Structure formats: C-alpha cells, structure tokens
C-alpha cells in the first residue's frame, strides 16, 4: 500500500531534528494528508462537471483549493504551483528542436551543431562558482519532483491507491473518479496537491513544541484541533470523504445527473435527479435570506424582553397604588370608628351625670387608652405612607413628607382635633393625586408606543400622522 510515510519522515527530520515521530503519528498524519488530497480531487471534479469541462482544468483545481483551504493558504499553494509549472514548461521548451525546410547549406548546419554543443556544455557544468552550489540541470530528476519530500510521482501513486481502496468497499461503484483515473502522472493537479501536502505538513510540524521528544498521534491531533485553519481543513476532509462515498454508491446511470455542491460550509449533495447546483449568486441570496431571518428572530427576542420589563413595571405600580388605596381606606375607617366612639362616650356622659368619681376616672382611662391606640394606628399608617414608592409624577414628595410630619406632631389630648387634622391632611394629599390613579388596573397600565411594539409591518407615515407629525410631498 502506497503512503506518504517516507516523505513525512524526511520533512520531520528537516524541521524537527531534535524530535522523533512515532509510527502512530506517521499513520495519523498520512491518513490526514490522504483525505486532504481526496477533498481537492472531489471539489475539482465537481467544478469541472458544473462548468461542463471535458477534463480537469487549472481553474477547476484553483477553485477547489479556495474551497478546501483558507484564502491565505490557498493563495500560497496556487502561487508556488504556478511558478513550478512555468519553470517546467520553460525547461521542456528548451528541448524542442527546430526543423529546417532544406534551404540551409551544410555550413549553417555545422554552425548550429557547434552552438548546440556549446549550450549543452554550459548547461551541464555542475561545478561550484564562488562558493555557490549549482543545482544539477538534470531534467530526468527534477521534471517530476516538486519538492524533496512530496514528488508528484508518489502523490499520483498514493492518490490512485486511495481511490482503489475506496471503491473496493462498494459492491457496484460508480464512475465518479473516472476523470482523474484517466489522467497521466504528470497532470497539473498532482503538482498542486504536492505543494498543498508540503505546506500543511510544514504548518503542523512547526506548531509542535521544540521540547517534545516524541511526536505521537495525540500531539498531532491536538495541534490540528487547536488551530482554527487546520481544524477547518480536517472537517472538510471528512465531509468530502463522506460525499465521495455517497457518490460511489450511486449507479453509473444516475451519477451523470448527480450534482455535488461543495462550498465553504460543505453542503451535502442530494441524490435526486432534479437537484441543481447552486451558483454563487443563488448562494449569496440564500445567505442574505438567512441573515434577514436571523435579524427577525433577534428582534422578536428583544421585543419580548422589552414587553416583559414593561409588564413588571406595571405590576409594581399596581401594587404601590393598591397599598395607597388600602392605607387611605384604613384611615377613613379609623376616623369613622373614632367619631362613633366619641358620640357614644358623650351620650354616656350625659345620661350618667350622677355616676361616682370612680366611674369617671375609668371613663377617662378608657379614653386615654383609645387615644393611645388611635395614635399608634396613625403612626403605623404614616410609616406605611412613608415607605411607599412614588406612584405618579404629579404627586409632590415634599408635600407628602410635610403632611406625614404634621400627622406625627398632632396634639393627642383631644380626639376631635385629631380627626379634623387627619381629615384635612388626607384631603390635601388626595388633591395632589389625580383621580385616574384610583381607577382600574387597565387604565393604569402604561404600554409603550406602538412604534416600538409592532410585530408585523406598519405604515410609518400613518404612525407619524397619528402622533401629530404630518408629512407633505414636495
């Protein structure tokens, strides 16, 4: 079975000479790189089919790289691969021989031969010049080697072996990978994959701490999961592998109409024949729709929270007003009871003129006790009023406080004076409280303006007109 194990070991020795990599670490990293190669191929095939290309073109490969990798990594891989492809093309161009029409004489042929021999001698000079090492100009070695670690011959063998193992799992696999299986080993897609493998492997090994003696599977897995870009690539590799498995399960007849839509979120494809591939414009429209629906949900949540707060405020206001009403009613009841007691006491005094002094003393004591109890009730009521929160902005807190102080400082010697003073204080306090405060709870509820409480589209002009603002067309 072909693998990237030798390449991983070479790159690890070059980047981490002080560390060793375990077999489990090599196995995990090899599977990660193989899945990444498959993701690039799956998206390249999808791009080729969606644009109705007969084969995989460079624009399809670059589109796949932009989907699988973040923009910075994709741009780096594309630029390096383009430079390598141009360099290889120039070297191959130098080997092309020009054909003459026979019009040249033998002297011209001899001169051409001399120039060719001179150029070959200059190109084959591999000696060092002023301390610089000259790279041997051997096209047989370097034409297919993108880097020292991941030659494209190895990339091609591992990719084809990966496809074969994936097809063995399925009883009747489709021809999804047929377009890549028909390509030669020097196809440009392997150049791009080779650079992608080296860039990602280098990124993983560099992030491993230099103090690590043994690089195992857990360390590599943790590095990938902790890095946002690498973890994103890992998720896309897994999803692309699942998509390829579904496509291989499809029959060859229905696979021609099967569309695979891979985007930055890797949307899973449907096996229905009527499904169509989303274009970039349709994807943008879908994104805008999702964003609008998200904004509407957020607005509903905020609006409901606002309404809950307003309801709580109304409930607190209602409780305060109920306490005030209860306090005033208690005061009125106490006044009536005291008046009745005073009348009864006066009648008893008139009817019982001849009662002895002991009875008079008892009556006086009873009166004093009644006055004390009444004073206690008044003090309790004053404390209740003092603890209340302000209900209406029209009520003047300073006047209420003065009235409470008057209530506490009333002379307790005469019940009639107490009753008259209490009634006058209550009247003065009630004058400052509007009659609407004593109405039902529904009238007391202050709801926010409809402009900030709507749950469906409204006519803004109509709302402004209801508020007294009229707009005229100019």
Swiss-Prot record:
Domain of life per record: Eukaryota
GO molecular function: DNA binding; protein heterodimerization activity
Residues covered by region (Disordered): 99-123, 276-295, 328-394
SUPFAM superfamilies associated with the record: Histone-fold (SSF47113)
Residue ranges, compositional bias (Low complexity): 100-110, 276-286, 329-368
Residue stretches in coiled coil: none
Similarity remark: Belongs to the histone H2B family.
Protein name: Histone H2B.v2
Annotated source species: Dictyostelium discoideum
Origin organism lineage: Eukaryota, Amoebozoa, Evosea, Eumycetozoa, Dictyostelia
